């Protein structure tokens, strides 16, 4: 994953082609798309590099995600049903299992699935796709922040609080719980910046 590689590390196109067993054309198109999303930089004479993380882009990403997902939390609390609550409960259990097993990659996936479940409950087609696109830059930091044990534990606590307020049908508290959960990202960003200053660009 791009966020877990050293920033500015060269992406060897031929190595990717060999590993995936595909032609140059789709790889080139994929790299151009990543460049458009600000994730890589392409230099025709020297190669393709992972872009440094731009603080402004990360904060914009977080702002958009918060606006979308706080509305999702309100909607879920208002329209909740047994099926939604059962699905969310399973996601919480899955995350806790991954946490106990110290499976960081799986924790990230289960974190995503919790939010994905809520988005799909509201509008099952485009909402998560839009959210996912909006949070691309933010996700680069999130991958790095899960290396911190305390954050892994807090994610579960925050998800449980979101779940409880949705289950209670309390729209204001559900929205506030989601807002606090997503705002904690600013704390995560500071930690990651302090630990990996060379990954970032102002």
List the predicted regions and their residue ranges.
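Single conserved hydrophobic/aromatic residue that forms the stacking wall/gate
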Residues: 1-8, 12
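Residues within the alpha-helical elements of helix-turn-helix
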Residues: 15, 19, 33, 37
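Helix-turn-helix DNA-binding motif, specifically the short coil turn and the N-cap/start of the second
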Residues: 23
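Beta-hairpin "wing" of winged helix-turn-helix
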Residues: 35-45, 49-52
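Conserved segment of winged-helix/HTH DNA-binding domains
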Residues: 51-84, 127
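Conserved amphipathic alpha-helical segments that form helical-bundle/coiled-coil interaction surfaces
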Residues: 61, 78-144, 157-165, 173-184
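C-terminal effector-binding regulatory domain of bacterial HTH transcription factors
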Residues: 171-202
């Amino acid at each position: 994953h791009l966020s877990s590689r050293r920033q500015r590390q060269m992406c060897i196109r031929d190595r990717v082609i060999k590993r995936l067993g595909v032609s140059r054309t789709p790889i080139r198109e994929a790299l151009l798309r990543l460049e458009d999303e600000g994730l890589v930089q392409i230099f025709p004479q020297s190669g393709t590099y992972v872009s440094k993380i731009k603080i402004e882009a990360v904060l914009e990403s977080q702002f958009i995600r918060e606006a979308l997902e706080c509305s999702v939390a309100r909607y879920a609390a208002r329209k909740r049903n047994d099926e939604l609550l059962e699905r969310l409960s399973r996601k919480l259990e899955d995350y806790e299992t991954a946490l106990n097993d110290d499976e960081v990659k799986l924790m990230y996936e289960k974190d995503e699935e919790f939010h994905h479940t809520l988005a799909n409950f509201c509008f099952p087609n485009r909402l998560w796709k839009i959210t996912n696109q909006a949070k691309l830059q933010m996700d680069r930091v999130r991958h790095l922040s899960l290396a911190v044990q305390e954050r892994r534990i807090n994610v579960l606590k925050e998800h449980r609080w979101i779940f409880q307020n949705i289950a209670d049908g309390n729209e204001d508290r559900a929205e506030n719980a989601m807002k606090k959960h997503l705002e904690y990202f600013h704390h995560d960003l500071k930690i990651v910046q302090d630990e990996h200053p060379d990954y970032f660009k102002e």
